């Protein structure tokens, strides 16, 4: 009897370990530039809130877009539990924006990684098709040290101008996924695709035969806005241009577009409370700001 009990307990523990949640995120953090700083949205200020937001969501792995090297350095300083893979799109080193994949160092072992350009020759740092900018897709092959599961994680930022570049870039990413995936390893794709759920590139991924849109297949969904906000908390749309796609082996439990913001200059104005407001509360008016001009997409799922 005791032996049977121990066997059952071991089986239950094994099942619990294999079904542990994986939280992933896609976040266009907006490149650091002087123009944003003049408008009150400088990286030095918003980066602190953005990293606090990421740490609260606690993703095991996440993809970012528009990231410059100095921003990566700041993020690693503020979130030392993470490491990253990826290179700058201009030269394959430190130049220009990255599309990095961040991962928790104590939870995941990096097995392999790489970057390819969304271009006719994906091995060269050059413009692809009708693109206005060089574009990359960075990827990592990871092993979960707790569950022993392995998976691929791809992250990209498609062109904002080139229609052909987006379509052909989507086809290239699907092709590279098929080329790299071994033994049907699960795969995750995050990114700012600069097109929404009604677009041709979106359909390329959906019709790949092995990818699902997390928004569509999630059991629970909290998405009251689109993913681009232009640094204005009042802006609203139903366009999701930041996406998370996963292979069909994943069970997606929760999907959210997180519209959290922060308050700036809260000491500038006295607020006029309503007649029913608690007298003990002294209110101030402030400026509501977003940590980026995109909202992060957060997904909770299981293998």
Question: Language model features by range: what are they?
Answer:
Residues 63-65, 86-87, 188-192, 212-216:
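Active-site neighborhood of phospho(di)ester-bond hydrolases with catalytic His/Asp-centered motifs
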Residues 164, 178-187, 195-303:
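Metal-dependent phosphoester-hydrolase catalytic domains
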């Amino acid at each position: 009897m005791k032996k049977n009990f121990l066997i059952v307990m071991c089986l239950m523990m094994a099942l619990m370990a294999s079904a542990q949640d994986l939280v992933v995120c896609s976040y266009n953090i907006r490149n650091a530039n002087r123009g944003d700083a003049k408008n009150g949205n400088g990286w030095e200020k918003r980066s602190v809130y953005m990293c606090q937001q990421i740490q609260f969501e606690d993703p095991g792995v996440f993809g970012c877009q528009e990231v410059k090297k100095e921003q990566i350095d700041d993020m690693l300083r503020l979130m030392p539990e993470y490491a990253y893979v990826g290179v700058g799109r201009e030269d394959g080193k430190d130049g220009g924006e990255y599309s990095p994949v961040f991962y928790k160092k104590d939870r995941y072992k990096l097995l392999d990684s790489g970057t390819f350009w969304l271009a006719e020759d994906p091995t060269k740092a050059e413009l692809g098709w009708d693109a206005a900018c060089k574009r990359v897709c960075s990827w990592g092959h990871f092993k979960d040290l707790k569950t022993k599961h392995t998976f691929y994680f791809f992250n990209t930022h498609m062109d904002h101008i080139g229609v052909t570049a987006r379509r052909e870039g989507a086809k290239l990413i699907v092709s590279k996924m098929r080329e790299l995936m071994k033994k049907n390893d699960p795969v995750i794709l995050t990114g700012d695709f600069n097109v929404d759920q009604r677009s041709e590139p979106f359909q390329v991924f959906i019709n790949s035969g092995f990818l699902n849109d997390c928004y569509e297949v999630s059991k629970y969904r909290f998405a009251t806005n689109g993913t681009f906000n232009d640094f204005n908390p009042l802006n609203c749309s139903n366009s999701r241009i930041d996406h998370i796609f996963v292979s069909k082996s994943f069970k997606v439990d929760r999907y959210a577009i997180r519209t959290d913001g922060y308050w700036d200059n809260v000491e500038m104005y006295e607020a006029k409370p309503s007649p029913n407001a608690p007298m003990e509360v002294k209110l101030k008016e402030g400026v509501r700001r977003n940590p980026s001009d995109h909202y992060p997409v957060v997904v909770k799922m299981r293998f």
